[in-house]
Amino acid sequence: MNHERSRGLYDRALSVMPGGVNSSVRATMPHPFFIERGDGGHVIDADGNRYVDWVMGYGPLLYGHDLPDPVQAAIQSHVAAGPMYGAPTEIEVEHAEFVARHVPSVESIRFVNSGTEATVSAVRLARGHTGRDKIVVMQGGYHGAQESTLVEGSPGDAHPSTKGIPESFAEHTLPIPFNDPQAAKKVFAEHGDDIAAVLVEPILANMGIVTPIDGYHETLRDLCDDHDSLLVFDEVITGFRVGGLGCAQSKFGVTPDVTTFGKIIGGGFPVGAIGGQAEIIEEFTPAGDVFQSGTFSGHPVTMAAGKASLEYAAENDVYEHVNRLGRKLREGITEICTERAPEYTVVGTDSMFKTIFTRDAPDDPDACCAGGCRQNPDCDRYDTCPKNGADVARAATDRWERVFWQEMKEQGVFLTANQFECQFTSYAHTEEDVEETLAAYREAI
């Protein structure tokens, strides 16, 4: 493939933007390819190269790059009426009502502008509600670019994971391993009276996709109940993608006190939201004393796109389609890995998928969950499948970025550029896209 124009755009970008990108995850070696437009389940770059797109904007694009007619009409109608008003609109009430009808944890909701803003606000809300400071997070989990959760280490030895965050911030954050009930019990035994909340993704979706072992979320729910702490599910990625309109919390049968949203809830436009029990959410100003505000919050175009997107999913076979393609991809990649790289682990659920380049092969190379790792203790791979962020970090992460991703790109398949970010199917993808992708996997694995 020719990437001459992308190279030139990157050189220009480097002169006016740090690293040549506006989000560090978009930086790739030797340089990013610049997208000119989307077309269904594909993107076309500045040099005219076409790719099957499984990145889907890192999750927001449930419908790919061609929005259904009702969604397009809703967006255009609100754009034509004026960009924004600095006052409430009916569409934000309607969108809130739809979410509250379908998501088990949501009685009340506050819309904001990004997933990061949602999790920042949720942490502040939990502290304000409980009068406590400490937040339990998962090692390897990700909750946006916020000071309270950009922390690594362990309880008692936590430190910021980036420059620019005071060490004192980490004193209030307690990182524990995902899928380790004993670690959760220990941190509550030692700090329970000071813990405002447990903040957890139902599925670790920024760490190669790690699903919970049986009973893990129930353990967190019980511990929070026993210590009057809040259980906060970060469903920025899984919301309205895993578990359909009920989100991942309905799939796992565990109801948090507070849920954060982003991505799909805005129909492809910038968005975030914090939902939960009314008595908790109403502690946000002006109803309560926990400050939260934003110029663009509840933006009418975003609200229209989000509401119309979810309504279309409720009335059509959207989830059946994307989940079927997701399973077909995972099954196909599993078959390829069994033949060519039995040490690799295929992960994902519903419309999410990823291959983790784990290093330890099982004794029986045919032993695997065909539709993606389900943390099944009866599976012969159970002990080698990643259970937490540290397990994924021990994989051959460098090979993904330097070799595998490059090869897939040259074969016209756009995947997330590192081992940790997950990939997504959309309503615009086809069986042919799946077959083309599996053929590329056979060459690249």
From Swiss-Prot:
The coding gene here is hemL
Q: Supply the CDD domains for this chain.
A: OAT_like (cd00610)
Family per record:
Belongs to the class-III pyridoxal-phosphate-dependent aminotransferase family. HemL subfamily.
Names of required cofactors: pyridoxal 5'-phosphate
Q: What residue intervals traverse the membrane?
A: none
The record's section on NCBIfam families has: PRK00062.1
Any one Gene Ontology MF annotation carried by this entry is:
glutamate-1-semialdehyde 2,1-aminomutase activity
Where N6-(pyridoxal phosphate)lysine occurs along the chain? K263
What Enzyme Commission number(s) does the record list for this chain?
5.4.3.8
According to UniProt, the reaction catalysed is:
(S)-4-amino-5-oxopentanoate = 5-aminolevulinate
Keyword Isomerase on entry: yes
What the entry lists under InterPro entries is as follows: 4pyrrol_synth_GluAld_NH2Trfase, Aminotrans_3, Aminotrans_3_PPA_site, PyrdxlP-dep_Trfase, PyrdxlP-dep_Trfase_major, PyrdxlP-dep_Trfase_small
Q: Has the keyword Cytoplasm been applied to this entry?
A: yes
GO cellular component: a single term? cytoplasm
UniProt keywords, alphabetically: Cytoplasm, Isomerase, Porphyrin biosynthesis, Pyridoxal phosphate
In its UniProt entry, what is this protein called? Answer: Glutamate-1-semialdehyde 2,1-aminomutase
- Annotated organism of origin: Halorubrum lacusprofundi (strain ATCC 49239 / DSM 5036 / JCM 8891 / ACAM 34)
Annotated metabolic or biological route of this protein: Porphyrin-containing compound metabolism; protoporphyrin-IX biosynthesis; 5-aminolevulinate from L-glutamyl-tRNA(Glu): step 2/2
Compartment list: Cytoplasm
